[in-house]
C-alpha cells in the first residue's frame, strides 16, 4: 500500500544496468527465438558509456531510446520466476528514473502489472501490489505520475477481488486521496476516471457504500456543458440506479443537484420521474407509477430486477414522511399498516427497520398500538415543511407559555407564603420578647415590695427593744 517515500538503492551506471537488464529479458525471451534486446541496445549504449567515463553530461534522448526498447520488451517479466519478479521490476523502475519523462514509461509498466503474473497465480496480485506500491513511493508526493501508478494499484485490487487488499487501501482513500487529487492537478476527465476505478474496486470488494460515494464524486466532475453527452448520461444512470437500489441511501439531494442527472429529465424521463417519487413522494405514488410504467421498460431495464428492493425502500421512506408530518407525534398501527400496505402484525418490524435506517426515532407502544415519534427526517424541505415547522413551533410556544404561567403562579404563591411565614415568625418573636419583659418587671416589683416591707419592720423591732 502507498506509504512514506521510498528510495531504491541500486549500484551501477545506467549503461551497465541497462545492459544487465537486457540480458535478463533475453533469458526470459529465449524460447521466442527473436532478436535479442541486448543486440538492439548495444549501439545505443556505446556513446552513453563514453559519456559516463568522461563524466560528460549524458544524452537523455539517447537514454530514452534505450528505455523504449527495454520497456517494450518488459511485459515478459510477468513470466519471470516468483522470487525474481520484484527485484527485476525494481531494476526497471530505477532505470526509468533516468528518463527525461518517466511518466511515459511508468504508465506502461503499470499496465503490465495490472495483467496476471502467470508465474505465480496464487501470489501474483500481492506481488503486483508490492511492486506498484514501491513505484508509487519512489515518486515525489506532487508527481503526477503517481496518478497512473495509483490506478494500477486499484486495478489489481479490483481484478483480484481481494477484500484484505482493499481494506488495507481504504484508510488511504479516506485520509490521503483528497490531498493527492489536489497535488496531482488532475483535470475533470482524469478525476472521473480515478473515482470510477475506486468505485469498481469497492464494488468488487463488497463495499457498495464506498462505491456509491465515489460514483457520486465521479458524477460531480462532469461540466455543465457536457451534462447531455452520452458518457454523462451513462454515468448519471449508473449513479441513479446505484442510489435507488442501495439499501442505505435515502438522501437523493446530491443526485438532483447534478446537471447530468437533471439532463435525464429529457433523455430518460421515466427514470427521472422515479427519482422524484423517491425524493418526496409515498408508496401510493410509487405503486401508481409502477402500474403505469413497468420497471423493465425504464432506461433499458436497469431496474428490472430491483422491484422488491425499491418497494421496501419506498415503505421506509413513506413511514418517515408519515412520522414527519403527523402533528400529534403519535402514529397508530392501523395508519402505518394502511400506508405501507402491510399486515398489522408486521407494523413493528417496519418501524424497527425505519429506525435502524436512521430515518426516525421513537418508541413503540404495544399497549396502545401506536408509534410515539421522537424525531423524524424530512425527505425534502419546502414551503409545506416550513408550514409544519411553524405549526409545531406555535404548539411548543403555547406549551411553554402554559409552563411559564404555572411557574409564575407557583413563584407568586411561594413569595406570598414566604412573606406570611416571615411575618408570623416576627410576631411570634415579639410575643416572646413581651413575655420576658413582663416576667422581669414582676420580679423587680416583688423585690421592691420585699425591701419596703423590711424597712417598715425594722423601726418596730427597735421600738420593741427600747
Swiss-Prot record:
Keyword rRNA processing in annotation: no
Compositional bias (Low complexity): 451-460
Composition-biased stretches (Basic and acidic residues): 433-443
SMART domains (alphabetical): PINT
Residue span(s) of domain PCI: 211-378
Chief location of this protein within or outside the cell: cytoplasm
Biological process annotations from GO: formation of cytoplasmic translation initiation complex
Keyword Cytoplasm appears in the UniProt entry: yes
Gene Ontology CC entries for this record: eukaryotic 43S preinitiation complex; eukaryotic 48S preinitiation complex; eukaryotic translation initiation factor 3 complex, eIF3m
Keywords: Cytoplasm, Initiation factor, Protein biosynthesis
Region (Disordered): 40-62, 424-466
GO MF annotations, alphabetized: translation initiation factor activity
PROSITE patterns: PCI
Compartment(s) of residence: Cytoplasm
Quaternary context: Component of the eukaryotic translation initiation factor 3 (eIF-3) complex.
HAMAP family xref list: eIF3m
UniProt family annotation: Belongs to the eIF-3 subunit M family.
Function: Component of the eukaryotic translation initiation factor 3 (eIF-3) complex, which is involved in protein synthesis of a specialized repertoire of mRNAs and, together with other initiation factors, stimulates binding of mRNA and methionyl-tRNAi to the 40S ribosome. The eIF-3 complex specifically targets and initiates translation of a subset of mRNAs involved in cell proliferation.
Name used for this protein in its record: Eukaryotic translation initiation factor 3 subunit M
Species this protein is from: Aspergillus oryzae (strain ATCC 42149 / RIB 40) (Yellow koji mold)
Amino acid at each position: 500500500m502507498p506509504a512514506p517515500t521510498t528510495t531504491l538503492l541500486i549500484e551501477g551506471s545506467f549503461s551497465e544496468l541497462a545492459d544487465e537488464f537486457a540480458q535478463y529479458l533475453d533469458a526470459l525471451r529465449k524460447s521466442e527465438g527473436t532478436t535479442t534486446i541486448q543486440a538492439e541496445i548495444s549501439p545505443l549504449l556505446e556513446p552513453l558509456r563514453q559519456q559516463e567515463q568522461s563524466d560528460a553530461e549524458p544524452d537523455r534522448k539517447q537514454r530514452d531510446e534505450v528505455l523504449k526498447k527495454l520497456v517494450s520488451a518488459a511485459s515478459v517479466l510477468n513470466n519471470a520466476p516468483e522470487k525474481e519478479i520484484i527485484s527485476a521490476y525494481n531494476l526497471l523502475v530505477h532505470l526509468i528514473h533516468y528518463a527525461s519523462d518517466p511518466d511515459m514509461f511508468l504508465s506502461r509498466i503499470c499496465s503490465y502489472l495490472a495483467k496476471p503474473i502467470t508465474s505465480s497465480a496464487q501470489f501474483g496480485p500481492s506481488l503486483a501490489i508490492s511492486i506498484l506500491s514501491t513505484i508509487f513511493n519512489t515518486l515525489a508526493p506532487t508527481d503526477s505520475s503517481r496518478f497512473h501508478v495509483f490506478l494500477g494499484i486499484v486495478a489489481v485490487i479490483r481484478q483480484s477481488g481481494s477484500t484484505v487488499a482493499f481494506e488495507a487501501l481504504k484508510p488511504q482513500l479516506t485520509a490521503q486521496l483528497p490531498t493527492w487529487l489536489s497535488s496531482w492537478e488532475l483535470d475533470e476527465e482524469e478525476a472521473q476516471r480515478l473515482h470510477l476505478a475506486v468505485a469498481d474496486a469497492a464494488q468488487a470488494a463488497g463495499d457498495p457504500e464506498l462505491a456509491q460515494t465515489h460514483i457520486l464524486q465521479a458524477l460531480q466532475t462532469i461540466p455543465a456543458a457536457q451534462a447531455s453527452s452520452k458518457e454523462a448520461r451513462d454515468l448519471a444512470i449508473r449513479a441513479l440506479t446505484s442510489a435507488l437500489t442501495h439499501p442505505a441511501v435515502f438522501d437523493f439531494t446530491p443526485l438532483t443537484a447534478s446537471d447530468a442527472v437533471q439532463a435525464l429529465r429529457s433523455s430518460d424521463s421515466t427514470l427521472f420521474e422515479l427519482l422524484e417519487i423517491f425524493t418526496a413522494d409515498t408508496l401510493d405514488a410509487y405503486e401508481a407509477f409502477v402500474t403505469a410504467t413497468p420497471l423493465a421498460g425504464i432506461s433499458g431495464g436497469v431496474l428490472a430486477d430491483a422491484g422488491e428492493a425499491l418497494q421496501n425502500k419506498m415503505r421506509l421512506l413513506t413511514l418517515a414522511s408519515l412520522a414527519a408530518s403527523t402533528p400529534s407525534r403519535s402514529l397508530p398501527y392501523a395508519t402505518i399498516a394502511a400506508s405501507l400496505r402491510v399486515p398489522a402484525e408486521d407494523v413493528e418490524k417496519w418501524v424497527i427497520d425505519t429506525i435502524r435506517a436512521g430515518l426516525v426515532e421513537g418508541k413503540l407502544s404495544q399497549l396502545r398500538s401506536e408509534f410515539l415519534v421522537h424525531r423524524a427526517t424530512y425527505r425534502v424541505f419546502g414551503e409545506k415543511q416550513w408550514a409544519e415547522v411553524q405549526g409545531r413551533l406555535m404548539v411548543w410556544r403555547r406549551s411553554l407559555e402554559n409552563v411559564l404561567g404555572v411557574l409564575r403562579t407557583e413563584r407568586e404563591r411561594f413569595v406570598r407564603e414566604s412573606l406570611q411565614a416571615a411575618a408570623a415568625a416576627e410576631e411570634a418573636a415579639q410575643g416572646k420578647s413581651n413575655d420576658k419583659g413582663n416576667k422581669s418587671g414582676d420580679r423587680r416589683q416583688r423585690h421592691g415590695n420585699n425591701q419596703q416591707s423590711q424597712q417598715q419592720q425594722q423601726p418596730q423591732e427597735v421600738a420593741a427593744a427600747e
